[in-house]
């Protein structure tokens, strides 16, 4: 919804980054779209609304149509958000008893969204965060809803890398973590990402 109104009002509401570095430029969505010949554009719903497909429209379709105006050949993808931490107030306030219940609603909503805009796929970040807990991680959030700065962000990075490149996520040399990630956590992250992507290590 926020991005929809930013388009209508042509708001320069975004910090433009290039290869992860700030340019200190404030830009609008049109400027971002026109800044390169993007081959992929991802969409996601804000986490608290993500389980409820009714909140996606009419904004999602309008945003997709707007992007198509400037990038007629780009592929669309939905970036699946994740469930809140078990036992947290945020989970309770969202109306769910368990993270699994919230994730099931997220999956359904994202599939409906992908179908609605003709997306080429869904980046399974929510599935990865949940699977990591099953694979032995005790904590994947830093504040019950954002990904943890070490393991969580690394896991999500592996999911994106594997999803878009099709390459193995086993031996990734990245080491510039905000919070240390142990060798065991690296192994869990790689195994988890491979599992949700349906690939082998």
Describe these PLM feature segments.
Residues 29-30, 60-64, 107, 111:
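Generic structural signal for well-ordered alpha-helices
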Residues 1, 46-51, 81-86, 127-131:
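Solvent-exposed loop/turn segments at secondary-structure junctions
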Residues 65-76, 119:
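A short helix->loop->beta-strand "cap" motif at the edges of active sites that frequently abuts
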Residues 39-45, 75-80, 121-124:
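Structural recognition of the beta-strand scaffold that forms the well-ordered cores
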Residues 94-201:
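Catalytic His-Asp segment of secreted/periplasmic serine-dependent ester chemistry enzymes
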Residues 1-57:
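Conserved SGNH/GDSL esterase-like catalytic core that processes O-acyl groups on lipids
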Residues 33-37, 70, 115-116, 154-155:
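Extracellular/periplasmic catalytic domains that process cell-envelope and extracellular macromolecules
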Residues 45-54, 85-99:
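Surface-exposed cleft-lining segments at the edges of enzyme active sites
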